[in-house]
Amino acid sequence: MLYLTKISNAGSEFTENEQKIADFLQANVSELQSVSSRQMAKQLGISQSSIVKFAQKLGAQGFTELRMALIGEYSASREKTNATALHLHSSITSDDSLEVIARKLNREKELALEQTCSLFDYARLQKIIEVISKAPFIQITGLGGSALVGRDLSFKLMKIGYRVACEADTHVQATVSQALKKGDVQIAISYSGSKKEIVLCAEAARKQGATVIAITSLADSPLRRLAHFTLDTVSGETEWRSSSMSTRTAQNSVTDLLFVGLVQLNDVESLKMIQRSSELTQRLK
């Protein structure tokens, strides 16, 4: 019995919780070797019995049998895929239908958000927001997809009155870093935490007495060790990916939370500036 095919084709027959389970299994089939029903239930916010019943609905005796069957099917499909299909992104291949691709992408992003939010230390987050709010100058560093996240945050912060530099050129990033002063803040965005350009800038900022805030993964890294504060992000993407999709989703959830927290801290003035910005841009239409 091909359980993966059965799961893909039975979408309309599933309840809301069953669809959660189906989406999780499809998006994480390559990781099932290390997933238990207890972990899965906790992550999805459902009972273990719901997972067992789902497995039985598909014809398996329980979750263990379903899990092992899915692992076997995935391994077999990988061997076939190596010869017939292209590996496009994470667990997505050129043989997947658009519906399956959509489900895999959506679940990948949902998991990144859920796991990242579950890690938040809100007392520490509040402290970080207060530190940023008092900074005379803010530098944001990042490369590739992380640079896009940083650029978005810089626009948001400038809208509510903060002096921000977010340069794409790494030489300029380094130049700005060495000119930071005590009280200034550098927000370094790097999922790996090991990009030499970002680490170099963090070292320079710290040497000048600036506060370094890293938005990075849980992995031990040079950036994590340099930072005064860290904001953790989790992404379920495999090493092979066409683009940092769920990583950017996780990073954006952190930067958006920082922005809204800063708006809340100085709500009256921030809202006035947001309104003025909106009025000005409306005049350009």
From Swiss-Prot:
Native source species: Escherichia coli (strain 55989 / EAEC)
Keywords per UniProt: Carbohydrate metabolism, DNA-binding, Repressor, Transcription, Transcription regulation
Record's protein name: HTH-type transcriptional regulator MurR
Domain HTH rpiR-type: 1-77
NCBIfam families, alphabetized: PRK15482.1 (NF012026)
Molecular functions per Gene Ontology: carbohydrate derivative binding; DNA binding; DNA-binding transcription factor activity
Assembly with partners or alone: Homotetramer.
Gene it is expressed from: murR
A GO biological-process term: negative regulation of DNA-templated transcription
Domain SIS: start-end pairs: 128-268
Pathway annotation: Amino-sugar metabolism; N-acetylmuramate degradation [regulation]
